[in-house]
Amino acid sequence: MTERGLRGESITREEALEILRSSDDELMSIIAAAGKVRRHFFDNRVRLNYLVNLKSGLCPEDCSYCSQRLGSRAEIMKYSWADPQKVHDAVEAGIAGGARRVCMVASGHGPSRRDVERVNGMVRSLKADHPDVEVCVCLGFVDDEKAASIKEAGADAYNHNANTARSHYGKICSTHSYEDRMDTVEVLKRNGLSPCSGVIAGMGETDEEFVDVIFDLRKHGVDSVPVNFLLPFEGTPLAGGAQHITPQWCLKRLAMVRFAHPDSEVRAAAGREQHIRTMQPLALEVVNSIFLGDYLTSEGAAGAADLQMIEDGGFIPEGADGQPMVHTDVNSHHSANLPVNAVPIRHRGIGTEVPANA
């Protein structure tokens, strides 16, 4: 598997299942093998991505996992389009913290033309101030006209996750289909936006279904694969549904994704702090990307803590110049001490008077 991975070739479905079903005793050997592939294509670099939540909550979609879904009782912050100055401040905090890519996200089915123009203005402003920083946009479903407009404004990438396998999708969401999502990925590709599309592991899918979606993403030629692990928000249908997720379970999935997408950006995304916990440094041996700071509606690790983890592992933040300006309180993050069903809700950054976490 390793030799094929070094040539940029994917593993087979059978090999992928073997990794997922391997014993915990084999984990370190699997990580070491996947790590050779990761370092071959990405050396010791780690790409830091930074999320900016432009519009939070009140989404008309009914995705079962989502704290922003229709009918969600999760006690998250809800706000319409954020003040441009607050967006600017959050972006500056993320870049100062070492972010290589800024991800601008808004809840909802998809943007109106007015919404697209609003976000395009933010993209142009960011690119004018920081031409070397990549911009990823995530606004839901878009057609060719809107995708082309976002690309013309200067966006580099667009995130639209598959989330789970086609065969499992109806159990997770009823307001749109898996096909709708993958059709959107093709729209992005046609219009020159780098497609970022990944999964949420731990939503009741079988091993076979997890393999199906990962291989389908390869078939669609996505450039970046964020791997999230279910955050079981209270007030959502999947609350309490993450008891089976262990650090070893997560690491096997990350390793399998690396072997399936050897030369793609693989990101340990939401849920890594809560589910991989003290074994997060091992994840860096497999993935080449993480999020810096907070997520859309939940808190992430303190920026300084993640940067220290990267340095301690012998890795280098990609694109960071000199000493990043980050918070110094590396003990402020407490997710590792929380039970798996207690999701730390975000109460800082956009929507509050508290500075962003970066």
Curated annotation (Swiss-Prot):
UniProt remark on cofactor binding: Binds 1 [4Fe-4S] cluster. The cluster is coordinated with 3 cysteines and an exchangeable S-adenosyl-L-methionine. Binds 1 [2Fe-2S] cluster. The cluster is coordinated with 3 cysteines and 1 arginine.
Binding-site residues for [2Fe-2S] cluster, renumbered to this chain: C103, C136, C196, R267
GO molecular function ontology, one term from the record: 2 iron, 2 sulfur cluster binding
Catalyzed reactions: (4R,5S)-dethiobiotin + (sulfur carrier)-SH + 2 reduced [2Fe-2S]-[ferredoxin] + 2 S-adenosyl-L-methionine = (sulfur carrier)-H + biotin + 2 5'-deoxyadenosine + 2 L-methionine + 2 oxidized [2Fe-2S]-[ferredoxin]
Domain Radical SAM core: from-to ranges: 44-272
Documented EC number(s): 2.8.1.6
Binding site for [4Fe-4S] cluster: C59, C63, C66
UniProt protein name: Biotin synthase
Lineage: Bacteria, Bacillati, Actinomycetota, Actinomycetes, Propionibacteriales
Gene name of the encoded protein: bioB
